[in-house]
Design a protein with these regions (language model features):
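Short secondary-structure boundary/capping segments
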Residues: 142, 148-149, 182
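Short glycine/proline- and charge-enriched loop/turn segments
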Residues: 132-142
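Short, compositionally biased segments
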Residues: 181-182, 189
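A generic "structured core" feature
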Residues: 157, 171-175, 180-181
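Conserved coupling/switch loop of ABC ATPases
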Residues: 166, 184
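Short beta-to-alpha loop/turn elements within the nucleotide-binding domains of ABC transporters
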Residues: 120, 168, 180
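Domain-scale signature associated with acetyltransferase and cell-envelope carbohydrate enzymes
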Residues: 1-123, 127-129, 146, 150-155, ...
Length: 189
């Protein structure tokens, strides 16, 4: 039975090497199409990226993405990076994310050596007006939607299925517990 297990594990290792080359190349092309400046990356799985005209995205060295249930069992939405027309996304060096979503409608800044767990959602916008009259009138504009920048420091760990809301600053070395909702800033720690 052991030879079968070893053969299976060897096939899986070969598959992961081939898949990494394929998905990294695919992601580089998607980044290029969207104008994302990225020094170096490694990807496993298909990330969905959309940088609107006028939006900017810059990613440092050593960016690592795992997305899709074939490559990570945590989180189920896949990796999504969405930057609005006036949005700015800045990601530092050695940042890893698994099946996480980042929406930068105004500004999201992520420092160096940050780990973003599966299912994490980082939103700098409410997406819609919180005023029910405006929201239901059919006249809602981008100016009616509340937005505020998010800043995540260096060496931060964001646990699985956490939500980081608009206006939050997370200090260097902080740990965000799995399943938490951050609506207020978190000190260094």
């Amino acid at each position: 039975m052991r030879p079968v297990i070893y053969a299976f594990k060897a096939c899986k290792a070969i598959h992961l090497k081939i898949a990494t080359v394929f998905w990294t190349t695919y992601t580089r092309i998607i980044f290029w199409i969207n104008g994302v400046k990225c020094d170096s990356l490694k990807a496993l799985g298909r990330a969905r990226v959309n940088v609107s005209l006028g939006g900017k995205a810059t990613i440092g060295n050593g960016f690592y993405i795992r997305t899709g249930q074939s490559y990570t069992e945590v989180g189920n939405l896949g990796t999504r990076i969405l930057v609005g027309p006036q949005g700015i996304l800045t990601i530092g060096n050695n940042v890893g994310m698994s099946n996480a979503t980042i929406v930068a409608d105004q500004s999201v800044t992520i420092g160096d050596n940050v780990m973003i767990g599966g299912g994490v959602q980082i939103f700098d916008t409410n997406f819609h007006s919180t005023d029910p009259i405006i929201r239901t009138s059919g006249t809602e504009t981008r100016d009616d939607v509340k937005k505020a920048p998010i800043a995540i420091g260096n060496n931060v760990f964001i646990g699985t299925n956490s939500l980081i809301c608009k206006g939050v600053t997370i200090g260097d070395g902080a740990i965000i517990a799995a399943g938490s909702v951050s609506v207020k800033s978190v000190p260094s720690g």
